[in-house]
From Swiss-Prot:
Predominant localisation class: cytoplasm
Pfam families, A to Z: AA_kinase, Acetyltransf_1
Cellular localization per UniProt: Cytoplasm
Documented EC number(s): 2.3.1.1
Family stated for the protein in its record: Belongs to the acetyltransferase family. ArgA subfamily.
Organism: Neisseria meningitidis serogroup B (strain ATCC BAA-335 / MC58)
Protein name in the entry: Amino-acid acetyltransferase
Gene3D superfamilies, per database record: 3.40.630.30, Acetylglutamate kinase-like (3.40.1160.10)
Biological process according to GO: L-arginine biosynthetic process
HAMAP family the record matches: N_acetyl_glu_synth
GO MF, one annotated term: L-glutamate N-acetyltransferase activity
Additional information: In bacteria which possess the bifunctional enzyme ornithine acetyltransferase/N-acetylglutamate synthase (ArgJ), ArgA fulfills an anaplerotic role.
Stored CDD domains: AAK_NAGS-ABP, NAT_SF
């Protein structure tokens, strides 16, 4: 595929996700190691692009690794309790200095990301005392000193800024009602802000590719329950990351995504492609199959039209779909329709037919056809069908590889046999015996 064709294909794939995210809130928790050099510039450019696409953005950065480096340079050993930093007065002052410096750098990078365009819209970045904090106190006998936790989030003020089109920038600092300043953990703060705003997505930008399974492979999608199971075998930081992600999901955040922010364009790839690039965690499973309803008809028609034009599927009018929608099941990935299949029944109670099995060209490698077939088989078994037919002009081998055997016209139910003879397609007939 040529470069222009690739661009068109990728842009078309991105459009539904852009539409889905426009006007929605995204909270990003940013590892402080990403806020320097060329990585900062590229991240700022992508953040600016998201803002101009109409996405409401709240950015929270950490300071842990900066503080650890400074402590080591000064011969001091940082102390942690349950993964939270014990923050003395020196560390707090350094965190305040870092917060001011990194905000200035990010503002400059954000301005630079749009400066090459005439009449480029500004991308305002705002901060404020949106977070009220309190001291953590003592944990397991350890005084956490100036380490704090969020007591209250001024959600109304945050929404006011987001409504105005501003990007909200939150440092890892919060102030108490007594006027003291406390250092905040980035993971917890990002999750808390996302819950307060009921954000569509919480994205953690880290230096890892996502959450790994015990065998070392990347877990691309996880339910909250699956993520918690992985946390039991993970290291301390990964365990805290998963814990914050699950807390956000349980608080009403729609999706949590964990990705390598140092990889150029990773944020855009994660948000605007079907499979993403990191680990995406949802409260429930990502791919689901459900009964179709009348509202799905335009999407089903659009999905099967190319296959009808190629002669792979028999043409089905809108009227046909309206009258037979109860036969259809649809497969959704992340809320988007990627496949459909129908189960037709006949007077002969033990016979059924899987029909109109279709998967979007953008999802041919996702195993969705297998899932739809398994769903139809389970559905057929549930209503007492013992023989499931498939009629195909050019996918007979696919069905044969999945337990279907060549059958004769005489084995079709009588009403289906009449249709078969009249439509002139001369489809291959296959049947699979279903065992209870």
């Amino acid at each position: 595929m040529s470069a222009p064709d690739l661009f068109v294909a990728h842009f078309r794939e991105a459009v539904p996700y852009i539409r889905q995210m426009r006007g929605k809130t995204l909270v990003a928790g940013i590892d402080d190691r990403l806020l320097e050099g060329d990585t900062l510039n590229k991240l700022a450019a992508d953040i600016g692009l998201l803002s101009q696409l109409g996405i409401r953005l709240v950015l929270i950065h950490g300071a842990r690794h900066f503080l650890d480096r400074h402590a080591a340079a000064q011969g001091r050993t940082p102390h942690y309790c349950r993964g939270l930093r014990v923050t003395d007065e020196t560390s707090l002052e350094q965190a305040q200095q870092f917060a001011g410096t990194v905000r200035s750098r990010f503002e400059a990078a954000l301005c630079g990301s749009v400066s090459g365009f005439a009449r480029a819209p500004s991308v305002p970045l705002v901060s404020g005392n949106f977070l009220t904090a309190r001291p953590i106190g003592v944990i397991d006998g350890t005084d956490m000193e100036y380490a704090g936790v969020i007591r209250k989030t001024d959600t109304a003020a945050l929404r006011f800024q987001l409504d105005a089109g501003n990007i909200v920038w939150l440092p890892p600092l919060g102030h108490s009602y007594s006027g003291k300043t406390f250092y905040l953990d980035m993971l917890q703060t990002a999750a808390s802000a996302a819950v307060s705003l009921q954000a569509e997505k919480l994205v953690y930008l880290t230096l890892s590719d996502g959450i790994s399974r015990p065998d070392g492979t990347l877990a691309e999608t996880l339910s909250a329950q699956e993520a918690q199971s992985l946390a039991e075998h993970a290291g301390g930081e990964t365990r805290r990351l998963i814990s914050s992600a699950v807390a956000a999901l349980e608080g009403g955040v729609h999706r949590v995504q964990i990705l390598n922010g140092a990889a150029d364009g990773s944020l855009l790839q994660e948000l605007f492609t079907r499979n993403g690039i990191g680990t995406s965690i949802a409260k429930e499973a990502f791919v689901s199959i459900r009964q179709a309803h009348s509202g799905d008809i335009p999407h089903i028609a659009a999905l099967i039209r190319p296959l009808e034009e190629q002669g792979i599927l028999l043409h089905r009018s809108r009227e046909y779909l309206e009258n037979h929608i109860s036969e259809f099941s649809i497969l959704e990935h992340d809320g988007n329709l990627y496949g459909c299949a129908a189960l037709k029944t006949f007077a002969e109670a033990d016979c059924g037919e899987i029909a109109c099995l279709a998967v979007s060209p953008q999802a041919q490698d996702g195993g969705y056809g297998e899932r739809l077939l398994a769903h139809i088989i389970d559905k057929a078994r549930g209503i007492g069908i013992s023989r499931l037919f498939a009629l195909s002009t050019n996918t007979g081998e696919w069905f044969a590889e999945r337990g279907f055997q060549t059958a004769s016209e005489d084995e079709l139910p009588e009403t289906r046999r009449k249709d078969y003879r009249s439509n002139g397609r001369n489809s291959h007939i296959l049947v699979r015996r279903l065992h209870r």
